[in-house]
Amino acid sequence: MAILYYDEKKLFQLNTENTTYVIGLSPEGYVGHVYYGPLLHGEPDLYPLRMDEPPFTPSVNKREKSSFLDRFPMEYPTGGVGDYRESCLNIRNAQGRMGCEIFFDSYEIFKGKRPLTGLPASFGTEDEVETLEITCKDPVLDLVVVLSYSVFTKENVITRSVRVKNEGSEALKVEKIYSACLDMDNEDFEILSLHGSWGRERHIQQGALRYGKQLVSSGKGESSHQEHPFVALVTPGTDQERGEVYAMHFVYSGNFIGQVERCQFDTVRMV
């Protein structure tokens, strides 16, 4: 199986032929990113989440919420709850308050990949792809957020998407929604993107990953030849034969933002 769940450890393991992606659940129900890299042989563990490490001072981590959330490696961060890095989902309620906090509710693993209604998307047979859907809920807003991960084993690709549903009686405004997030420790990464113009698309641009935010985007209603909807983190000296590359690429895009943020703890968030 490409996707495994370890109930005792509260871990999901997604395997392609050469890579492993691991998702873990904190005791509070936050969905966290544990690992993405070369294929793991055997069960993973939760310790990379570092949930009990002191966030700022050499004292016991008492789970003070704002300091905990501002360093926890989220799978899908939301705005207005204490994680001050870039969020993937911002919701405003009918009273004008902005905030959304989602917790794990349930999961489903199945063969194949469901289509994205109204959008072009990757596809595959039940023999080619396996999908994990993690359902999260905000109990205050009655909001459901479904995180979808489809594993194309032979291609070493994991595709991601998100669905949001308002199950309450109050109107909610979606101010921002991104497809995915990847939180990682910094490994002296450089940022790589593709720029161009008419007749000379897809030129490689690579440089230092600075503290703060760096992004590529298009507001033209299409992905554009000026900025391609692609961003990657690469280790120094990477070329087509060696090095580590962690990349995100839209299958299709109108307006888009691809952003990388290096934070105070020297971790990296890519959305």
PLM segments and residue spans:
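Polysaccharide-binding surfaces and accessory modules of carbohydrate-active proteins
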Residues: 10-13, 17, 31-271
